[in-house]
């Protein structure tokens, strides 16, 4: 395992593989919530040093009433944005360069989020672990979790957990040949 690799993805999807409605809507995520259960998200967030978001995901979360990543370094990948909010920084360049820079800055545990971004990092061989929370709903259409990836990624299931809401959480480790 290369030490400079961003390590984790934590994402929710519908049973049919969508992470958002066609318009980017996330209201359906509420189907997975019961009571105060956070499905390990707080523990996950406490274990990361920084987040890398794609432009689309950034634009969705920027519309939230409260910035959800307080206290974490947030890097937005985009070739089209000119600026981002003060709590984030903009990056346009090679993913391997970003991973190496973060490692040398002491950032070792990174959450990569957003369908296109996750796909690009998988294609680059820069993801070690994926946690997928499957929400018990079929959307029928929307934004898929994975885009075309020109690299096969062998995954090893490390744990599963089901919840009363119908949510099923799958944790995978990505096998790397390096």
Which sequence ranges carry the predicted segments?
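Enzymes that bind and transform nitrogen-containing heteroaromatic metabolites
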Residues: 1-178
